[in-house]
UniProtKB/Swiss-Prot annotation:
InterPro entries xref list: CASP_dom
Biased composition (Low complexity): 1-12, 24-36
GO cellular component, one term: plasma membrane
Keyword terms of this UniProt record: Cell membrane, Membrane, Transmembrane, Transmembrane helix
Side of membrane Extracellular, spans: 82-99, 160-174
Family recorded in the similarity comment: Belongs to the Casparian strip membrane proteins (CASP) family.
Membrane topology (Cytoplasmic): 1-60, 121-138, 196-206
Protein name stated in the entry: CASP-like protein 4B2
Membrane topology: Multi-pass membrane protein
Principal cellular location given in the protein's record: membrane
Quaternary structure annotation from Swiss-Prot or TrEMBL: Homodimer and heterodimers.
């Protein structure tokens, strides 16, 4: 009886599986470390872009807010000055409305000057007022004019409410509209003061 050699039996058996090396990184497929690095880079870029947008908005907001305040104050000024309809319906008969007229004129002149200043700064890239002094000026003067507007509103609103409780006519309607416009001017300057305060807090002196 023929004997099968042991070497022949070993040759007949299939070879064991050999673990194949991973060539995915060499073939261009990103590994986990590269993917993580890519994701981190995208987050950094997004944060930088978001910061640029925020700084751009903060840079343009003083012009927009002061222009809005000037427009609202001008409308309030015109409404009060033209509110003359004879007899008791004359704005200059009431010191509250005279005060409102004076403060509206002041707010219009101040806001217009500030809007022109910021427009010049954005157009030429140079602020007529030095940066440190300009931010302090914006923060302080915005608050002062906003406070004066609020004091004028506090004086004019009660007498207007008393008049409207007795009679509603062109005079009282015009006065109420002027008060509304002055209030919007106050809101614009208050927001501008907040922006100026934020810029002032971020200012470096080194």
């Amino acid at each position: 009886m023929a004997m099968v050699p042991a070497d022949a039996d070993a040759a007949a058996k299939p070879p064991p599986d050999v673990e194949k090396p991973d060539y995915s990184s060499q073939n261009g497929a990103p590994n986990s470390a590269a993917a993580a690095a890519g994701g981190g880079g995208g987050g950094v870029v997004d944060s930088v872009v978001a910061r640029w947008r925020r700084e751009d908005m903060l840079d343009k907001s003083p012009l927009a807010l002061h222009a809005a305040a000037a427009a609202f104050a001008f409308v309030a000024l015109v409404l009060v000055a033209s509110n003359q309809h004879g007899d008791w319906m004359e704005f200059d008969r009431y010191q509250e409305y005279r005060y409102l007229l004076a403060i509206a004129a002041l707010a219009f002149a101040y806001s217009l000057a500030q809007a022109l200043r910021h427009a010049l700064r954005m157009r030429r890239g140079v602020d007529p007022v030095p940066t440190a002094s300009g931010r302090l000026l914006d923060f302080a003067s915005d608050q002062v004019v906003a406070y004066l507007l609020m004091s004028a509103l506090s004086a004019a609103t009660p007498i207007t409410n008393r008049m409207r409780s007795a009679v509603i006519n062109r005079f009282t309607d015009t006065t109420a509209a002027a008060i509304s416009m002055a209030f919007l001017a106050f809101v614009s300057l208050a927001l501008s003061a907040i922006v100026s305060g934020y810029k002032l807090s971020k200012q470096t002196y080194m």
